[in-house]
Curated annotation (Swiss-Prot):
It comes from the Bacteria. This is Thiosulfate sulfurtransferase YgaP. The lineage of its organism: Bacteria, Pseudomonadati, Pseudomonadota, Gammaproteobacteria, Enterobacterales. Transferase that catalyzes the transfer of sulfur from thiosulfate to cyanide to form thiocyanate. May have a role in the detoxification of cyanide to the less toxic thiocyanate. May also be involved, directly or indirectly, in the transport of the thiocyanate produced across the membrane from the cytoplasm to the periplasm. PANTHER family: THIOSULFATE SULFURTRANSFERASE RDL2, MITOCHONDRIAL-RELATED, THIOSULFATE SULFURTRANSFERASE_RHODANESE-LIKE DOMAIN-CONTAINING PROTEIN 3. Its EC number is 2.8.1.1. The keyword Cell inner membrane applies. Induction: Part of the ygaVP operon, which is repressed by YgaV. The operon can be induced by tributylin (TBT), a toxic chemical used as a biocide and in textiles and wood preservation. It is an enzyme of class 2 (transferase). The catalytic reaction induces conformational changes within the rhodanese domain, as well as in the transmembrane alpha-helices. Homodimer. The active site is at residue 64. Residues 15-105 form the Rhodanese domain. The chain crosses the membrane at residues 116-140, 144-158. It comes from Escherichia coli (strain K12).
């Protein structure tokens, strides 16, 4: 089912007329940065619990970070929100910001966990390669180990590095 994609400015007009804006990103992404009018309903929660019945007769605009998550899950979102009139925000919150519309940013919140994993994994791989060339070839094993961990995470859905980073003090929420 093809859902209508709308521009940020069109979405803002619909919101002003009572449409509900639903952010399907994870809580850590939302807490760091979100559109002020958006309500958080992560895709994983929507899949389990569905949409509240009171919203099923509203206009609903779903959004994510860049629009990919909403477009990839358009059929699921349509089924979850039926019979509501459903729209997808073009380019997600990134498009909203590019259009010059306001976002609420909380820099005291940590970066989203997956970004932390990408930074840590990329840094460890780079360190392993640089040290492997300059100090001792044994350091290449570090890069191989991190690469194997990422491969395992992709296949199994379990990311040990994400679990470890989630336990770090800066990721502990009060």
């Amino acid at each position: 089912m093809a859902l209508t994609t709308i521009s940020p400015h069109d979405a803002q007009e619909l919101i002003a007329r009572g449409a509900k804006l639903i952010d399907i990103r994870d809580a850590d992404e939302y807490l760091r940065e979100h559109i002020p009018e958006a309500d958080l309903a992560p895709l994983s929660v929507l899949e389990q619990s569905g949409l509240p019945a009171k919203l099923r007769h509203e206009q609903i605009i779903f959004h994510c970070q860049a629009g990919k998550r909403t477009s990839n899950n358009a059929d699921k979102l349509a089924a979850i929100a039926a019979p509501a009139e459903i729209f997808l925000l073009e380019d997600g919150i990134d498009g909203w910001k590019k259009a010059g519309l306001p976002v609420a940013v909380n820099k005291s919140q940590p970066l989203p966990l997956m970004r932390q994993v990408q930074i840590a994994a990329g840094g460890l791989i780079l360190i392993g390669v640089v040290l492997g060339y300059t100090v001792n070839s044994g350091f290449f094993l570090l890069s191989g180990f991190v690469g194997a961990g990422l491969l395992f995470a992709g296949i199994s859905g379990f990311c040990g590095m994400a679990r470890l980073l989630d336990k770090m003090p800066w990721n502990q929420r009060a």
